[in-house]
A protein has these predicted regions:
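Short catalytic-loop micro-motif centered on adjacent basic/acidic residues
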Residues: 5-6, 33-37
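Active-site beta-loop-alpha junctions of metal-dependent nucleic acid enzymes
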Residues: 5-28
């Protein structure tokens, strides 16, 4: 339940794509799927094409009026209100400030979701494991390709 915060200028599709590019630049190798609500910013063609066609990331949508389908996200949004109360204007907020808040949120243990572990620690462990699997997969794929080429000779 790692939290990443990216400042979005507006809900316009071009601003969402720009914000997602920053997110993907930072965390792309760790992203396999996205589950979004049904906000207009997540259903624009520009955003859909960028995420699904260009990045090849599966995008899922929660059922309307079913916030429980994104329970962890709703919980983290409530926690974010400790730093930015509802109604706060993000006009003067800088990305650096959001990075600091995300770092603090990721350092706090999550009793239910992670059995008291800190999201940053779990994220790092999972990311390292994922990289090992990815390297093993690439080696296996390369070996199979070489075997196929040898069989063709």
């Amino acid at each position: 339940r790692f939290t990443a915060l990216v400042l979005v200028r507006s809900k316009k599709s071009s601003d969402m794509v720009d914000a997602f590019k920053l997110f993907y630049e930072r965390y792309g190798k760790a992203v396999r799927t996205i589950t979004a609500d049904n906000g207009s910013e997540f259903i624009s063609w520009d955003f859909l094409e960028y995420v699904q066609k260009e990045l090849k990331i599966k995008l899922y949508y929660a059922t309307p009026s079913s916030p429980q389908q994104r329970g962890s996200n709703e919980n983290r949004n409530r926690k974010l209100r400790d730093w930015y109360p509802k109604g706060t204007s993000f006009k003067d907020v800088k990305q650096r400030q959001l990075d600091e808040v995300a770092s603090k949120m990721n350092a706090m243990p999550l009793r239910q979701a992670l059995d008291g572990k800190r999201p940053m620690v779990v994220f790092e462990q999972e990311y390292k494991a994922m990289q090992r699997y990815r390297r093993a997969y690439e080696k296996r794929k390369q070996r199979m390709l070489e075997e196929r080429q040898n069989d063709e000779k």
